[in-house]
């Protein structure tokens, strides 16, 4: 009697993944465009901030970019864990597809943060705990991409990249703790926030958002839209990688068949 496959097992099949992603991609892309356009429009027409003036509008791109830079690395870490522990067929595909996208969003966060910092801090860059840790995250992305492309053996490259990704995941809580600290009363753990110019979160706080509704809602729309954009690009990247591996397998098979024909002809 055949056992019923779980959803995870079904999605582990590249053919099913291609079929499902082909259906979802247009919807994800459409939702992303609508939400980003609406969020940025609401942000552009929102009143200026009473302290930061018009420069507050950079927030509607900077904050989603920073969030997705960290989320992208978390996705790589989870995918790497799935590859090393569960040997999931698509885990490496997911990690490879997410790396350049996460790197792009992290770079966008660094650039927009510098543009935002100039009028607020008087300089484009300071070696602040938050800024430096996000820069380290960007270098980690570049390291993952460089390591993978420098090794011809795909199996070895995927495993080494997965190990590096899991080692580097410690940067994510470091980024968060650098400006907000960490408090776990039941463990007696208290890590104070560092002396940093970067402001703490104004949205996800235990005491509620510290941002006016006229700025909060455009930011949420924009963040949600960019999140849909991330998954659109990620899904498209996975499809491209699956197709690339299929083409490579076909070429290898064709070369093997050609060698067999040559060997048979030589034997005759």
Regions found by a protein language model. Give the residues of each.
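Polytopic transmembrane helical bundles with strong interfacial aromatic enrichment
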Residues: 2-268
